[in-house]
Amino acid sequence: MSTEITFDQLESFSKKWRENPDKLVFQASIMKNGIKAATENPVSKATVQPVFSHEVHTDKVSNQQQSGRCWMFAALNTFRHKLNGTLGLKDFELSQNYTNFWDKLEKANYFLENIIETANEDEDSRLVSWLLDTPQQDGGQWDMLVSIIEKYGVVSKSAMPETFQSSKSADLNHLLNERLRTDAVILRKAVKEQKDTAGLKEEMLAEVYQLLVMTLGEPPKVFDFEYRNKDNEFKQDLQITPKEFYKRYVDMDLKDYIPLINAPTKDKPFNQAFTVDYLGNIVNGTPIKYLNVEMDVLKKATADQIKDGETVWFGCDVGQLSERTTGIMDTDIFLLNQAFGFKTAMTKAERLDYKHSMLTHAMVLTGVNIVNNEVNRWKVENSWGEKIGNNGYFVASDAWMDEFTFQVVVHKKYLSKELIEAFSNEPIALKPWDPMGSLAL
């Protein structure tokens, strides 16, 4: 039987609060400065320093601005680190707007195909409701970027620079999602009336293409790659296609890279491959697929790749115990237990099961600090510009990584034969709303 809060209980709560006058100091500070500023731990700031025993040289950070393209920025940053080192470039970037254009067009097609497939289900079914909740968005995962690269290649940022709507995507997303939901109404009716949907869908995609061209620009079919390297030598490669550019200058075989996740919930055994139903961007593209491993395995592969001079794409819950001004991510960064007198004690698995944590953001791991063969902190390249953190770079304690990192992408050479074989097996399909299907923004 449900019970309401009584006035006797309220009096008891108030009395208990008044019995601890030491809390008044914290109360005054919190009410004036906010929870994070009032409880920031100076010991954490002093120990989580931006100094690392192993570090990959990288240039200034990029800036996704007011968009949710972190997963895209992070992946393209791993590519540009390799490219900049090979060609001797400084602060060169690949076009995030180019991949963004194709991602949105392909997500529109992916959504419309799913609407056609589910047209005979009720509008309020959980699956249809999930599809309609967000027809498309900025967010994504590693395998979505792989699909884009394999189909469309990449271009330099100068060949397709940022626009107002690529950097501030809210209005574009609102308009595009309104268009797609309208199209969903039409397609569902057409299926029920046994009308042709292929022609309708093509007309709809033509309208989406027009919308994207008007807001993001039209992607180049060929472009001129001209630059000066760090020795001031002029180089040029004229009329190169985006796929030729990727093959010639980046040339990473993305099929050799394996997404590892750490999801310690009862329904996800370790050393098992997983996928997520209805998650993707390109129809018949690279399927979403991960290998669930223990955290020690994930971190060792990550550290080994960094020690060999290659950065690592990773996905985490960036908002948890993170101080963005200083760029510190640490389980002890805030004195919350001391301030409020109670402790939140959920495990990583419980936070996933009870919707308190999931992958929300993708960044790049560029350094690791190892003392007496033990890792104690990691260097993180964010994509929020240079005004936060240490010129845009963050530092994550190893304890924070354990609790709030959910995915990394590493070369298969850093994994055992048994793990590579496990990844090659048929994956278990997770429901679309599983926390491992969340998108990095």
UniProtKB/Swiss-Prot annotation:
Q: Is Ubl conjugation among the key words of this record? A: no
Name a GO CC annotation attached to this entry. Answer: cytoplasm
Q: Which residues form the active site?
A: 70, 361, 382
Kindly list the cysteine pairs connected by disulfide bridges.
none
Enzyme Commission (EC) number = 3.4.22.40
User: Per its UniProt entry, what is the enzyme's top EC class, as one word?
Assistant: hydrolase
Q: What is the lineage of its organism?
A: Bacteria, Bacillati, Bacillota, Bacilli, Bacillales
- Keyword line: Aminopeptidase, Hydrolase, Protease, Thiol protease
Descriptive protein name: Aminopeptidase C
Q: Name one GO biological process term.
A: homocysteine catabolic process
- InterPro entries linked: Papain-like_cys_pep_sf, Pept_cys_AS, Pept_his_AS, Peptidase_C1B
Which reactions is this enzyme annotated as catalysing?
Inactivates bleomycin B2 (a cytotoxic glycometallopeptide) by hydrolysis of a carboxyamide bond of beta-aminoalanine, but also shows general aminopeptidase activity. The specificity varies somewhat with source, but amino acid arylamides of Met, Leu and Ala are preferred
Domain of life, per lineage = Bacteria
Transmembrane region(s): none
Belongs to which family?
A: Belongs to the peptidase C1 family.
